[in-house]
Amino acid sequence: RCRSKKIICNYHGRRFDDEGKFEFMPEFKETINFPRKSDNLHDFPLFVWHNLIFVGLNPSFSIEKVFEKINERISFLPLQNLKLDKKLSKDYSIDANWALYCDNYLEGFHVPFVHKDLNEVLDYNNYDTEIDEYFNLQIGYAKNKDECFQIPKDHKDFGKNIAAYYYWLFPNLMLN
């Protein structure tokens, strides 16, 4: 739902109500057959998960159902408190096909050679992959208990030394 009473296009001056219904455009008062229903803003499915907003232009599956399953696994994490820390953030600009990037994210054979810090934490010989209809989950286990999540007793992963959950949602969203 829009928080403003009006939506105004700064480029054309078109004005819409808070539901996206066309109201006005400068210099078009006398135009025949204007406005039409097609001049209203389109309605797109919107889903908010913590501080992330997802819009489906033509969704073929329910993102809400996908995140319900993800929440079953990681709801114990205080995701609502996450804030960007620029000191811990790294940006990489790469010239690669998106599918190749996804493939790189999903295969872990390169970790010992490319991600030295991560390789010190993860037990390379202990790794699980779970496949769902629209996402997969890779679970990285820690070499020692100091590097793992504090998992609640009633959780399916309680007692496991899990250092990372790597989610890949079809076609190109990665969460870890």
PLM region spans:
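C-terminal catalytic domain of Rieske-type non-heme iron oxygenases
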Residues: 45-48, 52-176
